[in-house]
Amino acid sequence: MLDKNAKIYVAGHRGLVGSAIWKNLQDKGYTNLIGKTHKELDLLDAVSVRKFFDEEQPEYVFLAAAFVGGIMANSIYRADFIYKNLQIQQNVIGESFRHNVKKLLFLGSTCIYPRDAEQPMKEEVLLTSPLEYTNEPYAIAKIAGLKMCESFNLQYGTNYIAVMPTNLYGPNDNFDLERSHVLPAMIRKIHLAHCLKQGDWDAICKDLNQRPVEGIDGNSSKEDILAILAKYGISDSEVKLWGTGTPLREFLWSEEMADASVFVMEHVDFKDTYKQGDKDIRNCHINIGTGKEISIRELAELIVSTVGYQGQLTFDSTKPDGTMRKLTDPSKLHALGWQHKVEIKEGVQRMYNWYLGR
């Protein structure tokens, strides 16, 4: 167990997972938390990161900061996804080592697994065949991060644990229509289409003022607003989504991801992540997921039902689906003592309630 007064740095504490980890730590009575916004500390800047570690001397680190996005963003910003994530990891993990951090938790992604991996995916399938092309740069960066943790542990005896969460959603998610992941993107699209159907321009303007789309906000003309929404497949009568709707995905409520992360930080050490006596020590990362899946079409229909939208859902099969099935095997985590509780229907309702309350 960690001392409640231990100095804990949460990198990315304003993001989807980082904010949930921060809240979970506070709820558990931890009193000495450190968080820096991107404006206060640019994790891409090695000099600034070293200065931060020199000054703060954290004892424990949650590395939840990353450059992330959905299929569209991964397709467009390939260089950014590999370069920025490698740089963040290099800086934070490197300075954690140089400053003798007692324990580090690195958050990766299940996109590290091969495109055609056997389902559900066990940790052992890593690097056994090619990755999904659309998110290959991001996946390679995350694989490098987990291998950094593993390699530092093996060479220097550090205690860096890598966890691979499935698709996450929850409070403080990213709802940018170009860069967000599938679930928050669908919630926003269907919500805006519902507002159009209801003629609720106050709600539309409020939404766009909070999250402008390509420079269009609530002060723009109705014509400009309708045009930009149409570009993203949003109208009063229809919501168009990428792909066929047939891929299967697994989703985990972000606050549960945070609980699992804190559980691992408190109770799991590197020696617990592999079989003692193994000649080759690898695949020491831990999947964090539900082990349950839903199709993209079924998810969209669940969101339509939750929002109350009366229009049509259509799928653009000329756009990529990404991996057709991506389900984690969380049995390693279960054996260590943690399991999820929030199912997808309850989670989507919570998510939409949070979105409306912003």
Q: Which role fits each region the language model picked out?
A:
Residues 4, 90-135, 161, 174:
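Conserved Rossmann-fold NAD(P)-dependent oxidoreductase catalytic core, especially the SDR/UDP-sugar
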Residues 11, 36, 61-67, 104-110, ...:
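SDR active-site strand-loop-helix element
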Residues 12-16, 20-28, 192-358:
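C-terminal substrate-binding subdomain of Rossmann-fold SDR/epimerase-dehydratase oxidoreductases
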Residues 26-51:
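Adenosine-cofactor binding site in Rossmann-like domains, unifying the SAM/SAH pocket
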Residues 46-86, 95-98:
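NAD(P)H-binding glycine-rich loop region in Rossmannoid oxidoreductase-like domains
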Residues 68-69, 110-118, 166-169:
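Active-site segment of SDR-like NAD(P)-dependent oxidoreductases
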Residues 82, 86, 134-146, 176-184, ...:
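Short-chain dehydrogenase/reductase
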Residues 133-166, 182-199:
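Active-site Tyr-X1-5-Lys
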